[in-house]
Structures are given as C-alpha cells and as structure tokens.
Amino acid sequence: MDASRDIGSFVVWDYVVFAGMLLISAAIGIYYAFAGGGQQTSKDFLMGGRSMSAVPVALSLTASFMSAVTVLGTPAEVYRFGAIFSIFVITYFFVVVISAEVFLPVFYRLGITSTYEYLELRFNRCIRLCGTILFIVQTILYTGIVIYAPALALNQVTGFDLWGAVVATGVVCTFYCTLGGLKAVVWTDVFQVGIMVAGFASVIIQASITQHGINKILSDAFNGGRLNFWNFDPNPLQRHTFWTIVIGGTFTWTTIYGVNQSQVQRYISCKSRLHAKLSLYVNLVGLWVILTCSIFCGLALYSRYRECDPWTSKKVSAIDQLMPYLVLDILKNYPGVPGLFVACAYSGTLSTVSSSINALAAVTVEDLIKPRFKSLSEKSLSWISQGMSVLYGALCIGMAALASLMGALLQAALSIFGMVGGPLLGLFSLGILVPFANSIGALTGLLAGFAISLWVGIGAQLYPPLPERTLPLPLETYGCNITHNGSDWMSTTEMPFSTSAFQIHNAERTPLMDNWYSLSYLYFSTIGTLTTLFVGILISLSTGGRKQNLDPRFLLTKQDFLSNFDVFKKRNHVLNYKLHPVEVGGTDNPAFNHVELNFTDHSGKINGTRL
C-alpha cells in the first residue's frame, strides 16, 4: 500500500455536521430548562427529580463511559496490540453485576445525592470530606484532559481548529448542564450515543467496502496476528492477558461504575430501584455494542495499513491519530461524513464532560455547602447548583488550556487518576461489606491503599516496563513509497501523551523495576482496593470494631439479593408493617420509610409512591 495515498481534508459540510451536533445538544438543554416547570429545587437540577426511566439513563451511562479517548484510543490499541482487548466484554459483565447487586442497593436505599454522603453516614465527616475533595481535584484534572486530548489528535490530522473545538466543547457542555441539569445531561447523552454509533457505522461500512468485505478484514487481521483473543498467561507483569483484563479490569472499572459520583448519580436518579438496576443491565448491552464497533475499527485499521503503517512512516505523529487518518482516507469522497466521525468523537467528549460538571456541582452542594448553610431554601440551592456548573465548566476549559502546557506530565496525571480509584473502591467496599469496619480502620486503610498504589504507579512512570512485557505486535512499512510525496503537512509536534521526558533514561534495571514497577497497569486499582480492605479490616479488629452498633441500612444484606425475586411474587397481598407506623398527612421519602413493603396492592402504588 502506497503511503503517498492522497487523503482528504475537512470541507464546509464537515463543519456543518459538527456544528449541528453542538446546536442540538444546546437545544436539549434549553428545552429542559423550561419543561415541567424548570429546575425548581436542587433535587430537580441534580437528580432529575428522581423520576428518570431505565432506558435513557442506560444510554447516558454508556455515552459518558465511552469518552473520545475510547473512540480514538481503542481502535489504535487493537491496531497496535491486537483484539485481546475484546475480553473486556467479560469484564463489563462483572462490573455491571457488582455495581447493580452490591453498591446500588445501599446507595438507593439511603436516598443520597452525593456518593460521599455514605462515607459520613457509615464512618465520619472527615472521611466524607477526604472523598469529596479527592473527587473534585481528580475530575477537574481528568475532564480538562478529556477535552484537550482528542482535540489535539483531530487537529493534527484533519486540521480541525484546536482551540475552537476546545472552547466550543466546554461552552456547550456548560450551557446545557447549567440550564437543564441532570435531565438535559441524560437526554443529550441519548442523542450523542446515537451519533457515536452512526460515526462508527460509517467507518465500518466504508472500510468493509474499501477492503472488499468483512471476511477480508478478518483474514488480514488473522494473518497479522491481531486475532489474539486468548492469552491465559498468569504473569501479572504482562500488560494484557485474559487474567489482567478480567481481574484487573473488573477492579479498575468498578471504581467508575460502582462508586464514582458521575455514574452513581445517574442510576440512583431513577424512579425506582427496579429502573435503576435495569439501567445498568441495559447499559451493558450498549457497552458491548460500542466495544464491538471500536474493536472492528481497529481490525479495519490494520487491514488498510498492514503494508505501510502511517505511524512508523511518520504520516501521523501519534498512535491516537490513526482513526482520524483512516476516516479522511476512506471517506474523503463523502462530504460531511468525516464531520460525522468528528461529531462521534466529540459526542464522547461532551457526554463525559457534562456528566463530570453535573457530578461536581452535586458533590459541592451536598458535601460542602448544605452542611454549612442549612437554612438555604431549595430554590437557593438550585441557583447555587447552576452557578457551580458554570464555575466548573470554566475550570475544565482552563484545565484543558493547562493540559496543553503540561507535556509529559499528562500521562502521569491520567495514571494517577486511575490509581486513586482503587483505594476509594476499597473504602466503600469496607463500609458496605464489612460490618465491623470502623472509622479508624477506614482512614488507615485508605491511606495505606493510596500509598502503595501511588508507589507502584509513579514507579511505572519513571521506569516503564520493557517492550517484551507490553507485547506490541509488528508493524510493516515495506509497502510505503519512500518519497512521501505530498506528506509534509503531516509533520506535526508529538502528542503530549508520550512520557519520554518524565522517564529516567539509562538507569540500570533493578529487580524492583523489572517486577514491581512492571506490573500491568490494570492491577494498580486492584492493589489499592485490596490493600485498603486488608489494612482496614486489620485495624478495625484491633480497635474495637466489633463493639459498634451499626445501622443495617449501611450494609449489603441478604434481603437486598432476595428482593430481586419479589417481582415473581403475586402483587395482591396485604402490606406487613413494622412497629413504626407512617404518620398521617406526611409524604414519606421511600428511601427512609419505616414501612416494610413486601407486597403492593393492585395499583402498584403505596402512598403515591410507585414501586
């Protein structure tokens, strides 16, 4: 394949498609600013009035999980390392089941808005503040990178204006988050996940035509060693094996679906626990669809460039730029379609950023403002929540600008963001699964988990694993035209995700570097979680944890699992009451109701509350 292939460039119709995606997203925000009386209370703004249905929430969960980093990065991952990444279909299943059956029942029962409220209810306010502040710092940092990274990759390949895209993304997200609250975020995500699927579909269809069929793409991938689905090597130092993806990946992504405010806030906004669980399980199908699309795009990349790798031949300066390069290569004769793919990538960015802004506003209001200013009315809290959305939107845009100056530190920042999730998962698991865990054990376990996960993570940045541990597959350039005719425009600065400036070169390799620091990155969260649990349990036992009298609402109980089967019981039985009757004339919060609702009447409602 000739590397001098004439690829296309962005035209007016591509910009029109991209602008249309932004305008529709903004219009959804305007609609939900006024629909149903607008955002009258903080609960309306932050939780959608706790009236959301399963399907839109499921699509929102999928959209916000699959950022532009996924749209651009996963196909490049498959191109470089093979389709073993597809084992994540198993990982996603475990993640969703754990989130739905372990964490959701407790969070939904308590009726909380901020995930970190649980930490105060279960332990103390100090631990709650630790979790809140850590989440705020991490999320601002990560969101800025999510805005900047895909903008840079697309700019260097397509010529798409870098800062125009960064500012437009940040402003539009802030606009519809501020006006429409969680409902706008969810329904915009529904629209954006459709754009993501359409963008992937356009690439898959045209790649299949260009490469003469799906069978040809799969045949090329097989001959090139890309269909490496099964690697059962138990060595934890290998970057991706079946075990690192299933075990390490489950811990890594449960930190997001199980305890991260951005995701938890969505499913506990559902109108019933059944809808909340359904949203997670329907979302699983969405995750599988998006992953399948991105895996196939990676195989199409290899089929197209198996004889002349654009990265090795300097046609692109970073592996993340391969998907935009492919789009301009195979879709150059279809004006507007390359713009659809850019809209696909930015839909991932918009969904992630909007979810982050809404979650940041929620934890700030619930964890930092309401406890200190208890006299504030719901209307005032709603206005404050909107103000927080504006503030955090501006901070995320500012972080994107700062990201452009950080260079090699970006990868370290992203890695640290992933590492701190493990100890937090361990902290929540300690509270929900260990009845005798106390605040001393929780805080000590959290600190120990952070220390060990940061140690291995930062060490891996300073002394990265050797190539034989990462198992990159060979890339060929024998089919390239060495004259590189017309390719000067592709000479760009290197993507800042290379950590070369942050690494210590020419250092003598020690056993610590070749073993501890070479651990698969997917095990960082695993180590943090298990360390937090182990130390937390040990310290709790030695500091009188068994003597505490704990409210069972804060724990996962057998009834939480058995209640899944209540749907099969007849619904015409009489209610069984506990000793505490409902007061006449009051409207009870179902999360704190003293009535044990074993069965419902024929209407399916109790005191106006739909089950």
UniProtKB/Swiss-Prot annotation:
Cytoplasmic-side positions: 31-51, 108-132, 183-184, 261-279, 360-389, 437-439, 540-611
Pfam family, one: SSF
Regulation of activity: Transport of D-lactate and pyruvate stimulated by alpha-cyano-4-hydroxycinnamic acid, but inhibited by the short-chain fatty acids acetate, propionate and butyrate.
Residue ranges of the motif PDZ-binding: 609-611
NCBIfam families for the chain: sss (TIGR00813)
Name assigned to this protein: Sodium-coupled monocarboxylate transporter 1
Membrane topology term: Multi-pass membrane protein
Residues of this chain annotated as glycosylated in UniProt: 485
Catalytic activity, as annotated: (S)-lactate(out) + 2 Na(+)(out) = (S)-lactate(in) + 2 Na(+)(in); propanoate(out) + 2 Na(+)(out) = propanoate(in) + 2 Na(+)(in); pyruvate(out) + 2 Na(+)(out) = pyruvate(in) + 2 Na(+)(in); acetate(out) + 2 Na(+)(out) = acetate(in) + 2 Na(+)(in)
